[in-house]
Amino acid sequence: MAFGTLFTRENNCRSTAIKAVAKANDIELNIVEAEKGNATAEHLKANGLGKIPAFVGEDGFALSECIAIAIYITSQNEKTTLLGKTKQDYASILKWMSFFNSEVLPNLIAWFSPLKGDSPYNKKTVDEAIKATEKNFAVVEEYLLHNTFLVSERITLADLFAAAIATRGFQYFFDKHWRAEHPAVTRWFDTVRSQPIFSEVAEKVELLETVTLTNPPKKADQPKKEAKKEAKKEPRRRPLPLPLPLRPAEAPAADEPAAP
């Protein structure tokens, strides 16, 4: 019997870690492909906005937000090591999941979505997203230079969740040159994605030699608007000159008698 239903869409990176821990814990989930903009009543029960991922358990328990769902599914195994060993580990897991969900992914989307034609292109917005992404991964690179994984020295839910989101960067932008400049992030990503718990459910991505997604798609050729034909203008007629005013009769001279 299924533990519950997960509303998502194919290759949704916020759902990858949920699927991974469910499989690792032998938890069966009904995966429902949510139609964008047409959420079912059951889907809306889990998330009133109709967003994904969303979860409804067989017991009726409804839950939205990817981090909450991932932790809930992971915690069904009381002996799991994916949530860390200490309270500090657990807090650190939440920290990294929140960082990748609220900082990393939105900027990656703002970078690749306009270039794919999925949203309107604005050069300033894309440039800002590129800068933010580089800044975010500079933080991750610095941390992973001194740590094998994001929390402690073994893989946790934070790594599964973060690697799924980082996949979008490696899929579209993190080419050979970028990887050479971020060896720690690259090593970590390769390590996590090679783990069966991740690879059995995650989207398969080929590492890039060079970036190809660099320009927005060309706008479809639009038929040229016909030039408006100017109406033939008739030559302006000069107005006729006004008649000169009549001159008043001259007054008689002072020494002449007035007419009777």
Predicted features and spans:
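GST-like domain detector, emphasizing the conserved glutathione-binding G-site
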Residues: 1-134, 141, 146-148, 154, ...
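Intrinsically disordered, low-complexity mixed-charge segments
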Residues: 202-226
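Proline-centered turn/helix-capping motifs that create local helix->coil transitions or kinks
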Residues: 104-105, 200-202
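Phosphate-coordinating loops and pocket residues in cytosolic domains that bind phosphorylated ligands
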Residues: 45, 162, 194, 203
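Extended, well-ordered alpha-helical scaffold segments
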Residues: 128-132, 180-194, 198-201
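Active-site-flanking alpha-helical
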Residues: 74, 165-166, 202
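GST superfamily/GST-like fold recognition
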Residues: 103, 107-112, 150-192
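Generic structural signal for individual residues within well-ordered alpha-helical segments
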Residues: 44, 91-94, 161, 186, ...
